[in-house]
Amino acid sequence: MAKDLDVNESGPPAARDYKDPPPAPFFDMEELRKWPLYRAVIAEFVATLLFLYVSILTVIGYKAQTDATAGGVDCGGVGILGIAWAFGGMIFVLVYCTAGISGGHINPAVTVGLFLARKVSLVRTVLYIVAQCLGAICGCGFVKAFQSSYYTRYGGGANELADGYNKGTGLGAEIIGTFVLVYTVFSATDPKRNARDSHVPVLAPLPIGFAVFMVHLATIPITGTGINPARSFGAAVIYNNEKAWDDQWIFWVGPMIGAAAAAFYHQFILRAAAIKALGSFGSFGSFRSFA
């Protein structure tokens, strides 16, 4: 296979100083026989459980502190800023802790985006999503068990479309919010960037967590911020409210579209995967330097 080249404006093209990892096999049954897969699945389950436990407790605590009927005040509690920090901060911590074991997905949309980019296999994708959803259900279940008097009264942290917004607006918010998150994941874990700066792999959880924080600031007033189907599904299962289930499709369809769009944009536009494939025919070889 020909060696890819980078642009060198002052002379001939220079040899690429990094190497892309080979694409993951689409379907690999051999993977099911290996312990590292199950270790990664367990890590995804536990990480998603902890993520939902801390973040949903934060949401319910904020609502309890600002409930005027219970003596709360409007300016009490952590506010939307604090809720956003809880979600973003937990993602930062958990991605940092699990990146070396499972990749630190903690989100079916991230897993699907990486699958579409051939970063993970179908087997791993399915097992991760199941583990993430089960972890989310257990995390919300613990919240209800420990805060039963507040859980149902304050909505169980379930994602619902806010009054005054139509479903199209909610869907758009979820698509764009998830695009921001998954695009950040691709950028933070880009092998080209990792090869050229040894600090990037260590710092990758920071921009990912910060992306979650920023998206929450923007979309909490609209949908309560999903951008993670497992988070929305787990809360809906434990809260079991009709409106939460009626709006549930928004928190699956939106994030999956956003993840697919981010995967396409990063792989085929920024990394020019399509041009590199066509370059093997010769006529497009000059475009390889832009990858």
UniProtKB/Swiss-Prot annotation:
Which Gene Ontology cellular component terms are annotated? plasma membrane; plasmodesma
Role of this protein: Aquaporins facilitate the transport of water and small neutral solutes across cell membranes.
Q: Which CDD domains match?
A: MIP
Residues recorded as bearing N-acetylalanine in the entry: 2
- Per the similarity annotation, which family is this? Belongs to the MIP/aquaporin (TC 1.A.8) family. PIP (TC 1.A.8.11) subfamily.
Q: What is this protein called?
A: Probable aquaporin PIP2-4
Instruction: Note the NCBIfam families from the entry.
Output: MIP
Q: So which stretches are on the Extracellular side?
A: 61-74, 147-167, 223-249
Source taxonomy lineage? Eukaryota, Viridiplantae, Streptophyta, Embryophyta, Tracheophyta
The organism of origin for this protein: Arabidopsis thaliana (Mouse-ear cress)
**Region Disordered: start-end pairs:** 1-22
Q: Name one GO molecular function term.
A: water channel activity
